[in-house]
A protein has these predicted regions:
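C-terminal beta-signal and adjacent terminal beta-strands/loops
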Residues: 94-96, 117-167
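Short, surface-exposed loop/helix-turn segments at secondary-structure junctions
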Residues: 99-104
Length: 167
């Protein structure tokens, strides 16, 4: 539109104005998960460990922004008949390989659990009822790739119930 709006478009109401442009970059990383299942009682116990890590630099040597930090994920699950229990710990490392305009994101540990009972409704479908707890350590955790990580942390300790019906 015309020039009658003058400089008002130069003001961004304290928001960051960024122009993202393509640059040559090199990404290096890996992701793996190992696990083992054991018979225990009349059910199965599964233990697993996973890790992922990504490093990314532009060809001039500065860091690509919004790259998630390395994570270690420990998991334990037990399944017996119509019951399933799962406990997981996500250990997210500090991200200090930051790009232009970013800030360091602290490490955190996220402990989650879930207990699910499945009801077979004799040809009328299947009902799963779960109770869960998330962020049981009540960590202040921030998503490094979020543009609003300073203002909006991840959810604190919370509990809930979930009902799922398949027909």
């Amino acid at each position: 539109h015309g020039d009658e709006h003058g400089d008002e478009h130069d003001e961004y109401a304290n928001l960051i104005h960024a122009d993202y442009v393509q640059e040559d970059a090199e990404f290096r990383g890996y992701e793996f998960e190992i696990g083992r299942t054991f018979s225990l009682g009349s059910g199965d116990l599964t233990l697993s460990f996973g890790r992922d890590d990504v490093n990314a630099e532009f060809s001039d040597g500065h860091n690509v922004p919004r790259i998630n930090p390395s994570r270690n994920i420990y998991s334990l699950s037990y399944v017996e008949n119509d019951w399933k229990f799962k406990l997981s710990l996500k250990d997210v490392e500090k991200q200090d390989d930051i790009g232009e305009g970013e800030s360091v994101t602290d490490s955190y540990q996220m402990l989650n659990t879930r207990l699910t009972k499945t009801f077979n409704l004799n040809g009328a479908g299947e009902l799963k009822v779960s109770i869960f707890g998330s962020n049981l350590l009540d960590e202040v955790a921030r998503n490094h790739s979020s543009f609003v990580k300073k203002q909006v942390p991840l959810a604190g300790r919370n509990y809930g119930a979930k009902f799922s019906y398949k027909f």
